[in-house]
Amino acid sequence: MAKESMKAREAKRTKLVAKYAEKRAALKAIISDVNVSEEERWDAVLKLQQLPRDSSSSRQRNRCRVTGRPHGYLRKFGLSRIKLREAAMRGEVPGLKKASW
């Protein structure tokens, strides 16, 4: 199980990403637009740097919903490989069964 502080930190990052998403997208659009003057683009770069570091979506880490485990995460289910296996063995995941060949 992940520490509660790590889960809370990840939740905080998710909120920050949602809060600054529009502002970040607007600044990135200005930066990538070649028709805008160099000075305006540079100002946009500086403003983007002023935003909180955790407001970037690349700082987020996918974590298991049950345990908070960061490794072995399966996006389709939102669980780690361990918890997915346990749920599948109990028959809690519809359409998923143990492979045999």
UniProtKB/Swiss-Prot annotation:
Name of the protein: Small ribosomal subunit protein uS14
GO cellular component, one term: small ribosomal subunit
Annotated family: Belongs to the universal ribosomal protein uS14 family.
Subunit structure: Part of the 30S ribosomal subunit. Contacts proteins S3 and S10.
Species the sequence originates in: Alteromonas mediterranea (strain DSM 17117 / CIP 110805 / LMG 28347 / Deep ecotype)
PROSITE patterns, alphabetized: RIBOSOMAL_S14
Alphabetically ordered keywords of this record: Ribonucleoprotein, Ribosomal protein, RNA-binding, rRNA-binding
Entry annotated with the keyword Ribosomal protein: yes
